[in-house]
Swiss-Prot record:
Keywords: NADP, Oxidoreductase
Family designation: Belongs to the short-chain dehydrogenases/reductases (SDR) family.
Protein source organism: Talaromyces stipitatus (strain ATCC 10500 / CBS 375.48 / QM 6759 / NRRL 1006) (Penicillium stipitatum)
Protein's name according to its UniProt entry: Short-chain dehydrogenase/reductase tropE
Gene, per the UniProt record: tropE
Disruption phenotype: Blocks the synthesis of tropolone class of fungal maleic anhydrides downstream of stipitacetal.
Membrane spanning stretches: none
EC annotation from Swiss-Prot or TrEMBL: 1.1.1.-
Pathway: Secondary metabolite biosynthesis
Length: 266
């Protein structure tokens, strides 16, 4: 099968966690894909490709690691030109790369700025850069990985996810380690909506995907805390993202999709 017979997908942060499981879910389907596995370092990208090939030895799809640091405009440009020179278009962009940092580890300003740089600005610039390739697809799809922690509706009624009452006094106890992370994901939801409306008339389908609380490096710091939701295998989130790529959630364009056909409130 030649490359032109396949759908072309780029997943940022594809060498581990949800990105890795999304790619695995895609190459387990009957639809032939050529997946660009976005990674920060050549060795980690190649290792992830080999691991996926071992896990899914029989597949109509092909894999290729590609270097992309979403905090580096030159890296994003190099990634774009590599994809452009090889195939000339892109069918699916999955903005998956994300981090969660704590002020207690590196200082508040550094933690918040770096989280916004990766989780919001990085996704914005990746999308802006790759739109010309998406517009050359017959069925362009744009996905932003968000979080249940980003939802304003439940947070306006109760302190989610712990549901605890924070006692008076200062300093406050550590309730959860995700303040910067959740704020960036709320911002990312607006980025998703902006692109949904900007690209709708061009035929680009855009979603936010909220994969649930997964057993990944991102989830490790919250697992077991009071009020923490049950931990799901990362493969559950990967299958959800893959289902959006496959067209199962086309009726929910412009929304934040959850598993089991549900939609997350903004």
């Amino acid at each position: 099968m030649v490359l032109s017979d396949k759908k072309f997908v780029l997943v940022t942060g594809g060498s581990s966690g949800l990105g890795f499981e999304t790619i695995k879910a895609l190459i387990q389907t009957n639809q032939p894909y050529h997946v660009f596995l976005g990674c920060l370092f050549p060795d980690e990208g190649q290792s992830a490709v080999l691991s996926l090939q071992r896990d899914v030895p029989e597949t109509p799809s092909t894999l290729e690691s590609i270097l992309v640091d979403v905090t580096d405009d030159e890296s994003i440009d190099r990634c774009f030109h590599t994809v452009q020179s090889k195939i000339g278009h892109l069918d699916v962009l999955v903005n998956n790369a994300g981090i969660s940092l704590q002020a207690s580890e590196i200082g508040m300003r550094e933690a918040w700025n770096r989280c916004y740089d990766v989780n919001v600005t990085g996704a914005q610039i990746m999308t802006h850069t790759f739109v010309p390739l998406l517009l050359r697809s017959n069925d362009p799809r744009l996905i932003f990985i968000t979080s249940g922690l980003s939802s304003l509706t439940p947070m306006s009624n109760v302190y989610t996810p712990t549901r605890m009452t924070v006692p008076a006094g200062w300093p406050k106890p550590e309730v959860h380690p995700y303040r910067a992370y959740r704020a960036t994901k709320t911002a990312l939801n607006m980025v998703m909506l902006e692109w949904h409306w900007q690209l709708r008339e061009d035929g680009v389908k855009t979603w936010g995907v909220s994969p649930g609380f997964l057993a990944t490096n991102l989830g490790a710091s919250f697992a077991g805390m009071d009020g923490a939701p049950p931990v799901l295998p990362a493969s559950v989130g990967g299958r959800l993202v893959a289902s959006v790529v496959e067209g199962d959630r086309d009726t929910d364009v412009g929304k934040i999709v959850l598993k089991d056909g549900e939609v997350q409130p903004f």
